[in-house]
Amino acid sequence: MKKFIFCFLCLWTLNIFAASKTYPNKLNRCKITRNIFNDYEPKVFETTNNLLRKTGRLSKFYGERILIKGKVLDQNCVPVADAKVYLWQAGSGGKYPYEPLKTRVDKRRFTSKSDSSFTGSGIATTNNKGEYYFISMLPYTSSRYLRSANIRIEHPSLTTLETRLDLSDQNMCDNECGEVNPILIEPQENMPSYCFDLVLQGTTLKRY
């Protein structure tokens, strides 16, 4: 009887460790995304994740429409739900179309006179998979300014992250990265997508 119980416990233990191999994040730690700060944050953010227009307005912009999307993770690689994601960027003309939060900035980088509906800022909330997305446009690029967007992520259990997203070809991805509302995207539209998985310092309550 004792031998039978011993064999049963051995098999049960082996099954536990064999199953755990399918969940590598139990032991992994994700590399925390480094902070890169930007002085051109808007004084007031638009409350939608569509930067191409204000809510209830028609779109009229000059440039290529894109998706910016990805996942927010904690340092244990666990997806972070209900994180607030703030995005801001310049338009195709290289200027920010809003009033800046800070006063000591280069005023030439901003414009309030434009017939474009592009707002330059937006807010999203991550879903239960840690996913977020924004509809935006490719910003201006030159030898001095690279194509990029700025992002800040806030969650009550984690350290706030602010960084820059490099909108270069190496960060392009297919349209299966994240969940996007099909109402906002035409099925036949081949919209360029840029994906960024961002890791915040700290851990959430749940574990994988």
Curated annotation (Swiss-Prot):
EC numbers: 1.13.11.-
Enzyme class: oxidoreductase
SUPFAM superfamilies in UniProt: Aromatic compound dioxygenase
Keywords: Dioxygenase, Oxidoreductase
Example GO molecular function: oxidoreductase activity, acting on single donors with incorporation of molecular oxygen, incorporation of two atoms of oxygen
Short name of one Pfam family: Dioxygenase_C
Highest taxon in the source lineage: Bacteria
UniProt keyword Metal-binding, yes or no: no
Family statement drawn from the similarity comment of this UniProt entry: Belongs to the intradiol ring-cleavage dioxygenase family.
Name of the molecule in the record: Putative dioxygenase RC0543
Gene source species: Rickettsia conorii (strain ATCC VR-613 / Malish 7)
Lineage of the organism: Bacteria, Pseudomonadati, Pseudomonadota, Alphaproteobacteria, Rickettsiales
